C-alpha cells in the first residue's frame, strides 16, 4: 500500500468517527443486515433499510460509498442511509472490495452485482425498482457514474466484461456528491504525485488507457439519466463537479447543480454526510426533493 493510501485510510477513519460520535439508530427504521450479494464473505454484504411502518413496495436508493476506493464500508454509512430511510425510501447500503488488495475494476463489478441483487430480490424486500436511484459520494459518485455509463455506452461496456448490461439496471436518476469523474485530467495535472495512488488502484503503474478507463465523464451519452450534482466551496474535488456539469449539459442530460457553502462558513468534502450540519441537511433535503420530482415522470 502506498503512503497516500495509508494516509487516506487513517484520516478518513478519524474524521468519520468524530462526525458520527453519539449517533443512535432511529427507532422508526427497520434494518435487514448482512445480506450476501456475492461470493466474498467479507465485502459482498449489504443492508436494507425500510421505514418501520411502510407498506407496499418503496422507491429504492442504492448507496455507493466513498473512501478513495481504499476505505469505507456499509457500517460507516449506516447513519446517512438510515436517515434516507426515515424519509420514506427503501435504502440499500452495501460494502464493496477495496484497493490495493482488490484493484479496479473490482469495485465497479461489485456495484454491478449489488444492483443485480436489488433487481432480482425486489419483490422479496419490498423494493420498487421502477423508481431506482443511485446516491454516491467521492469515489462512490465515480462508481455510480461509471456503472451507469457502462449500461448506456456499448463501447465503454466492452472494457468491463465482468459487468452485466441490462436495461433493468439503469437508474431513474443519480445523486452525485463531491465526486471524481475524470481521472485522466487529474493524472495529467498531478503527474508523479498521483502515480503511487493510481498504482494501488490499478495494481500496476498507470497507463493512459487504464486511467482513461477510470474516467466515466468521457463516456457519458445523451441518454444518461437525470443527475443532481453537488459540490461545495471546501471540496478538494470541486473542479470535477464543474467539469461533469459541462459534459452533462453538452450532452443534453438533465442536471441540477448545487455548490454549497459561504466564504465565512465553508463546507468541506462530503459535508452532507454530517447529519448535524445544517447545510448538509439542506443538501440532503434538496436531493430528496429531486428524487420525488423524478418519480413523477
Residue ranges and their predicted role:
Residues 1-297:
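Alpha/beta-hydrolase superfamily serine-hydrolase fold, recognizing
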